[in-house]
Amino acid sequence: MILVEGKVAGKKYREPFSKGVLARSLTRSGMDPTDAYLLAAEVESYLKKEKKKIVTIDELVKIVYNKLKEKDEKIAEKYIRWRKIREYKEPLILLIAGASGVGTSSIAFEVANRLGIRNMISTDMIREVMRKMISKELIPSLHESTFTAYKSLRTPAPVEFDEVLVGFRDHVNVVTVGIEAVIERALTEGISIVIEGAHLVPGFIREELINKNNVAMFVLTVPDEKMHRSRFYSRCRQKWARRPLERYLKYFWAIRRIHDYIEMQARKHNIPIIENIDVVTTIDSIVKSLTEDLVHKDVGKYKG
């Protein structure tokens, strides 16, 4: 039996080498599942050939990296990036922002899966909880969508202001209280989590939270309006979907204004902007940015 030796809280532990576990980690780094299992089997054969009884995690990572490099250097680099993020000691709070329809939900799910983060929540869910606690009479904008919040404005916006954005900001200001509470709780409990949704707007979350080394924010955009509009057709065609297509199309003009505003805020606050055209490219961009940002900010935070 081959044992893998690692460390947790400074204490060594050993566990049996598993092709399945290794294959899963390779898949999360972007490798095809079949190829991942074949490589895991190849690594096992190599360890047996070398008569290894005990192999440290660092040694195993090096072996895997070298074998990956022989086959595909890009996958090898992705694997190392994934390992660096996984080895980060602090909980990772990942915020995926963007207007309705740009794909924050699907990207958040895929990124969470890639990084092995089990906790994920949408800002829509946070808003729904807050709606149960705060009446429509008290804060009417909370009981509207992001793109219809302007309808609830008690005082009409001045002509020089965009009423859609005035309503949106009012709506986001309230939901941000709940978002910050989730972030604070995750930091306190040491829980990694992915939060996604249109209520995540650069400049609204307190700087003391957003500037933490282990909190990362990304803004997704879809520059082409036709492509953005087409996303709603695919989003609403599922039988389980409860969101009417007509409603999104009716207010698409407002959604685009919010889309551009979030992008503008991202540029203003130096938040990474990713054009979400291709899912794989978007995920790779997020993972690469995370390693460059988190790893280089504080190398002392890593195990080893």
UniProtKB/Swiss-Prot annotation:
InterPro entries: 2PKG, ATP-cone_dom, P-loop_NTPase
Annotated EC: 2.7.2.16
Disulfide bonds: none
Highest taxon of the lineage: Archaea
Catalyzed reactions: (2R)-2-phosphoglycerate + ATP = (2R)-2,3-bisphosphoglycerate + ADP + H(+)
Keywords (A to Z) from UniProt: ATP-binding, Kinase, Nucleotide-binding, Transferase
Pathway where it operates: Thermoadapter biosynthesis; cyclic 2,3-diphosphoglycerate biosynthesis; cyclic 2,3-diphosphoglycerate from 2-phospho-D-glycerate: step 1/2
GO molecular function: ATP binding; kinase activity; phosphotransferase activity, carboxyl group as acceptor
Function as written in the Swiss-Prot or TrEMBL entry: Catalyzes the phosphorylation of 2-phosphoglycerate to 2,3-diphosphoglycerate. Involved in the biosynthesis of cyclic 2,3-bisphosphoglycerate, a thermoprotectant.
Family: Belongs to the 2-phosphoglycerate kinase family.
Protein name: 2-phosphoglycerate kinase
Record organism: Methanothermus fervidus (strain ATCC 43054 / DSM 2088 / JCM 10308 / V24 S)
Lineage: Archaea, Methanobacteriati, Methanobacteriota, Methanomada group, Methanobacteria
